[in-house]
Design a protein with these regions (language model features):
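Cytosolic regulatory and coupling regions of membrane transport/channel systems
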Residues: 1-9, 13, 124, 134-349, ...
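A short glycine-rich beta-alpha junction/loop motif
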Residues: 453-455
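Cytochrome P450 heme-binding "Cys pocket" and the immediately downstream C-terminal segment
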Residues: 458-459
């Protein structure tokens, strides 16, 4: 909340105070959009999470400004439609790319639909300055609670430290739940914690290796958690409850990471089964790593994603389907907005950005099911517009509006927990910004445009598209199947490269989690849309069982050098069930 309060409001104040109101408004909008992407995590990861969408937004603003200045309505609509196709395809690559696609289109809508005297490059620089200001605050300010304990004088890595500690806590929670009803949910929580820590540690860097002792220590502590997570997953697969004492070691390691202290005494080993022996061995190795981590040069396994993967995702079935839908929504909304502009729906001013910008956020499937997005957007906009209409009649100008922008900026991080609340806060903030920039009070027309955008996106969302519906979900399932097969081949090949095995296991579980998220969103759609992905949840469950069994095989092979009949039987059962669902994951000859 502190970063939000110090972002948009002060930028707008600086612009108004220096007589550069229009650049101040753009900078504040950029800071607001960056604030929506500001999530808990490491400072290093925030550089990519905030910086890449900011660059895309500046590029969209640049393109939209020059296109709006030089093109008539029809060619401008075609250009914006092509941008929608590009941004939609890019959004299929991943979360950061999805945010970049959103910012690209919002920037283009503002550039074309909010004409200004400044040139395109001047507006783009103002946008970058606003997003850069929030990024600077993100890098410079400590997060709440980071100034306590032994790490209070070095809060640079508080996000990484919290993420790694959560991994050890998740391992302990899984061990507590083994053999119980909550075990599956705890295993999924462990995957999420490992994913979050991997992202926190793998942000952009100038040097190949960690430069400080504190960062090297965190890298080593994360790597030490991987065999612990592997052993805990093997125990989960076995399904037999373990003693309460088994979870004490990971909990003490979590406390040591969080407080940046030593591990202290660990519980005595309990070596009655191969998976328990693996857990005890991993715990002892982790304790040794904690003692000498500053001198270690271990790198966490990184995701093997390159430009070719991004291109395949953007041009694949999911990228094509999403790109066409975004292009149709964005192009149609821009055409309707320009038609309304020429009929003086907006009055005497030249701003028609609201309708296409609203359509961009509504067409994003990663913000929830379509019907839910539409209802939340409509309710949030109505509430926000009505609140702003009341406040605008009471607050002095421009001081009151600037204060309102600062308050809304502080509320954005809290409001991100619910799309309707976020919509209401952003509506008040944007209306205050553009009124400060000279646009008249337009709450009623904004409500009308939002409802029109909701209807448009609902219609387009149910239109048939070329190719198979649900392509994005099936593409993620196919990726998860390929990752599971690569992991299975490595384990049954009995390679001694554990780092490679851990990297493959991480990729298998991570792609499965991504597929699960996409399946859950698709299942929550209205029946007309949800039916296109029916049965995919069953495939994901079987793939998870296959990866869990592969992990149990890896641990058992390490301890005994051979598989039990139960391991082989479970592998064959999972592979046969996948075959029935049309997913082919061949069993290696080694089995």
């Amino acid at each position: 909340m502190t970063r939000g309060a110090l972002a948009a409001g002060p930028l707008l104040l600086a612009g108004v105070g220096t007589g550069h109101t229009a650049p101040g408004v753009l900078a504040a909008i950029a800071a607001m959009l960056a604030g929506i992407n500001d999530r808990p995590g490491s400072r290093r990861a925030s550089v990519r999470r905030l910086g890449v969408p900011a660059l895309a937004g500046a590029l969209g603003l640049l393109a939209g400004t020059y296109a709006g200045q030089g093109l008539a309505a029809v060619p401008l609509t075609l250009v914006l439609t092509l941008l929608g196709l590009l941004a939609g395809g890019i959004s299929a690559v991943g979360p950061v790319a999805s945010a970049a696609g959103t910012h690209l289109l919002v920037g283009a809508a503002i550039g074309a639909g909010m004409p200004a005297a400044a040139s395109g490059w001047q507006r783009a620089l103002a946008f970058l300055a606003g997003a850069g200001w929030l990024l600077l605050l993100r890098l410079a300010l400590p997060t709440p609670g980071s100034l306590a304990g032994h790490s209070r004088f070095d809060f640079r890595f508080d996000g990484e430290r919290a993420a790694v500690a959560e991994v050890y806590d998740a391992i302990a929670a899984l061990l507590d739940a083994v053999g119980g009803e909550r075990a599956t949910a705890r295993r999924a929580a462990l995957t999420a914690a490992l994913d979050h820590a991997q992202d926190a540690l793998a942000g952009p860097r100038l040097r190949r290796r960690a430069g400080s002792a504190a960062e090297r220590r965190l890298h080593a502590q994360y790597v030490a958690a991987l065999p612990l997570a592997e052993a805990a997953t093997a125990l989960f697969w076995a399904g037999e409850p373990v003693s309460v004492r088994a979870a004490e070691g990971p909990r003490r390691l979590a406390a040591a990471v969080r407080g940046n202290t030593g591990t202290g005494p660990l519980p005595a080993p309990h070596r009655s089964a191969p998976a328990l022996r693996a857990l005890d061995d991993a715990l002892l190795r982790a304790a040794e790593t904690f003692d000498r981590a500053e001198d270690a040069h271990q790198r966490p396994p990184a995701r093997r994603r390159d430009v070719r993967h991004a291109v395949r995702a953007a041009l694949g079935t999911g990228g094509r389907e999403y790109g066409l839908r975004v292009a149709l929504c964005f192009g149609a909304s821009a055409a309707i907005a320009q038609a309304l502009h020429h009929t003086r729906w907006y009055g005497q001013h030249q701003h028609w950005y609201w309708l296409p910008a609203t359509a961009v956020f509504l067409v994003k499937p990663d913000l929830g099911p379509l019907a839910s997005r539409v209802l939340c957007r409509a309710a949030g906009t109505v509430l926000g517009a009505l609140v702003f209409a009341g406040l605008a009649a009471l607050l002095p100008r421009p001081a009151g509006l600037i204060a309102l922008v600062a308050v809304c900026g502080a509320l954005v991080p809290v409001a991100t927990r619910h799309f309707a609340a976020l919509t209401a806060v952003v509506t008040v903030l944007v209306l205050a910004l553009v009124m400060t920039g000279g646009e008249p009070q337009a709450s009623v027309s904004r409500i009308g445009e939002t409802l029109l955008a909701c209807a448009l996106v609902l219609v387009v969302g149910h239109l048939p598209m070329p190719g198979e519906r649900g392509g994005g979900v099936r593409a993620r399932l196919a990726t998860a199947g390929s990752a599971a097969h690569a992991y299975l081949v490595h384990v049954l090949g009995e390679s001694g490269d554990r780092a490679e095995r851990w990297a493959l296991r991480r990729e298998a579980y991570r792609t499965l989690a991504e597929a699960r998220t996409a399946i859950a969103l698709a299942a929550a759609e209205l029946p007309a849309l949800a039916r296109h992905t029916a049965g995919t949840d069953t495939v994901a469950v079987v793939l998870e069982r296959l990866v869990d069994t592969t992990t149990a095989c890896a641990v058992h092979l390490d301890e005994t050098g051979r598989l039990t009949p139960r391991h082989v039987r479970q592998l064959r059962a999972a592979l046969d069930e996948l075959m029935l669902h049309g997913v082919e994951v061949p069993l290696p000859a080694a089995a």
